[in-house]
Each structure stands twice: as structure tokens, then as C-alpha cells.
Amino acid sequence: MSEAKNREMFEKALEAIADGQEYLALTYIDQASTMENEPLYLSSKALCVAKVRRSFKEAIYLCRDALEFEPTNPVHHLNLGKIYLLAGQKKKALSTFYDGLKHGRNPSILSEMEKLGVRKSPFFSFLARRHPLNKYSGILLSKFGLR
């Protein structure tokens, strides 16, 4: 298959992923197999493998390979975080999302974190979150738009 045809298949796969059609995306990705050394290909394939085949170890391995090639690309962090969520590893997913935000404010990462209900850190970090000082200072500061 020519390079242009592989690129076209991969573009179709990315569109299918965006539409939530992982089965179709995995089919396109498998057809574009000569792109196996490209990080975005690895990362996208990893997400599809996790969603379709439920093979989380393989998916995590593929996505980590993509991160080795491009550690500063937040899309790879997003995909790895989604894989961790599918595998039921919420703490690792959040950690991965935070790592991705260090490399750029990706709206998709922020959206995933919002779905998870990530809370802001307490105003007084040395006190418990439930402590009245933390509770009411947080409410007050958010009313004034300072938090």
C-alpha cells in the first residue's frame, strides 16, 4: 500500500475515533500498518485496542512507546489516561492527565478531568478538606472569582 493510501486510512481512523466508532477506527488503523513507527499511530491504535479488544496491557505498552517518541505531545497523555480509565485505574489516569497538561493546555484533557470531577486543592493545605476554614474560605473566594 502506498504512503498516501496509508495516510488516508489513518486520517479516516482518526475521524472514526472522534465519532466514537472504535471498531471502524481499528480496522482503518490495521490497514495503515506501515505507519507503525509514528507516535500518533501507536497512541491511536492503543486507544482502539483498549476499547475494542479490552487488552489493556497491550494498549498501555503501545501508548508508552508513543510517549517515548514524543513525550511532550499531550494527545498521547490523553490517550494513555483514557486507557487507564477503561482499565479502572483512576489515580494513574489523573496523574497522566496532569502530566499532559504540563506540556500544553489540551481542552480534551481538561474535559476528561472535568468528567471525573477533579477538585481544586484546599485553600489551607495543612488542614483537612472538611475543615470549616477550608470549606468557607473556598466558598467565599469562588464567589469573588478569586479561585
Locate each region found by the language model.
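Mid-chain, well-packed structural core segment of small domains
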Residues: 66-91
